From Swiss-Prot:
GO terms for cellular component: cytosol. It comes from Variovorax paradoxus (strain S110). Belongs to the Fmt family. (6S)-5,6,7,8-tetrahydrofolate binds at residues 120-123. Coiled coil: none annotated. This is Methionyl-tRNA formyltransferase. Pfam families: Formyl_trans_C (PF02911), Formyl_trans_N (PF00551). SUPFAM superfamilies: FMT C-terminal domain-like, Formyltransferase. Gene3D superfamilies: Formyl transferase, C-terminal domain, Formyl transferase, N-terminal domain. It comes from the Bacteria. Attaches a formyl group to the free amino group of methionyl-tRNA(fMet). The formyl group appears to play a dual role in the initiator identity of N-formylmethionyl-tRNA by promoting its recognition by IF2 and preventing the misappropriation of this tRNA by the elongation apparatus. Its EC number is 2.1.2.9. GO terms for molecular function: methionyl-tRNA formyltransferase activity. Keywords: Protein biosynthesis, Transferase.
Amino acid sequence: MTPLKVVFAGTPEFARAALEAIAAAGHEIALVLSQPDRPAGRGMKLQASPVKQCAVAHGWPVAQPRSLRLDGKYPQDAAAAREALLAARPDVMVVAAYGLILPQWVLDLPVHGCLNIHASLLPRWRGAAPIHRAIEAGDAQTGITIMQMDAGLDTGDMLLREAVDIGSDTTARLHDRLAELGGRLIVQALADIGRLARTPQPAEGVTYASKVEKHEAQIDWNQPADAIVRRIRAFDPFPGANSLLDGETIKLWAAHAAPPAEVSAAPGTLLAVSDAGVAVAAAGSVVMATELQRPGGKRLAVADFLRGFDLKPGQRFG
């Protein structure tokens, strides 16, 4: 394998796994692009992204432009990034959950263009939140697609794809599995760069994975139990599915659909409470919640939760 000069663009933990895999495979990390530091945590102190933290730890050069558009809101940032990219003289640019739009001048700059690691089986779930949306929709499988980027939103030709079963995964667990797979596939793609067949994405089966908003986390108990349970899994760890109970926001972190039963109580009503779980009426079905959290508290198995919070049948989420 001939080592390549790689520019890597990414921001969250998902991208860090790929960056480390590329470096471990012997490629030169010529430059790392990541989003600017953001306020985070209870103190809202500026915090570097996981990708920047990784780059700093390894001594790789980092640029954090607010935009790459030379004619956009931050032309000085874009111009400085362009100089850094030109100086890096990359063979290829690898992009994973970067968060900035790449204008055409960026796509054209590397010898082999820009490769993207996308956490879905394209063309299903193009966009910002493919892992969450695949779980929420009840998909049996998802996976990783390595694509040759073009100017569209996740519309480029596919180079490699590999599927995984979702099973009962939460977004947190599936994220980690796909991050590892993405690292393995991008290393394979770089080893075969210039020789991989490019497959255009089919026009059929296109769906879009919109960004997850906090307001979506509020549980609608008028939905069937299966749909509610999928949403609980999809929104773990962010934003955390929740529901109001006597004026307090309770997060539900784990649940399953109870065996089919005839339910006459209003949706959201607590039907039974025990150390095994809290049974809640849904649309013609029952959700059995097994892990809960109060504001400011920890995630607790229901038996531990009930030691500090009294729940009774007849109370109602809503």
